[in-house]
């Protein structure tokens, strides 16, 4: 709870430093803490495709954990509901790509994306039996490849 309070204080101060105001909502489950910062004019803290948000999360985690001496807590930051919106949009997109892969029979490599986005892709398509996904390459150029599933041999 102390890490959460420290993270809240840091985020509100960060928002103020760019001339924005925000309110925080904290959700704590065991060692997992999620702090949501909501308000107007916070887009600068999200950045293109959430790249700045990831940096804000990393800095907030380091500052909060060091100040509290707690390095076991997992801290996740969301700003303006970006992560939920990104998950929904990315899930919709990769479902369409998977449908195209099945229709054409050709694999398709997605653009390079950070680890949290790759996890969304794999999770969104995990229940499908007509395609397979895997990641290839090295960060920051690691990408997900969606391929048609190998045909199942019929037992005759």
Model region roles, listed by residue range:
Residues 1-156:
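RNA-contacting regions in translation and RNA-metabolism proteins
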């Amino acid at each position: 709870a102390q890490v959460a309070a420290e993270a809240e204080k840091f985020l509100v101060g960060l928002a103020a430093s760019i001339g924005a105001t925000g309110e925080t909502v904290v959700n704590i489950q065991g060692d997992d803490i999620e702090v949501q910062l909501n308000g107007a004019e916070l887009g600068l803290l999200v950045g293109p495709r959430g790249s700045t948000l990831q940096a804000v999360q990393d800095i907030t985690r380091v500052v909060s954990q060091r100040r509290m001496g707690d390095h076991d807590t997992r801290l996740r930051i969301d700003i303006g509901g970006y992560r939920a919106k990104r998950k929904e949009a990315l899930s919709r997109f990769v479902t369409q790509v998977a449908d195209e892969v099945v229709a054409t029979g050709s694999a398709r490599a997605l653009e390079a994306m950070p680890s949290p986005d790759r996890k969304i892709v794999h999770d969104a398509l995990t229940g499908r039996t007509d395609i397979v996904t895997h990641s290839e390459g090295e960060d920051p150029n690691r990408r997900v490849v969606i391929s048609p599933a190998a045909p199942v041999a019929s037992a005759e």
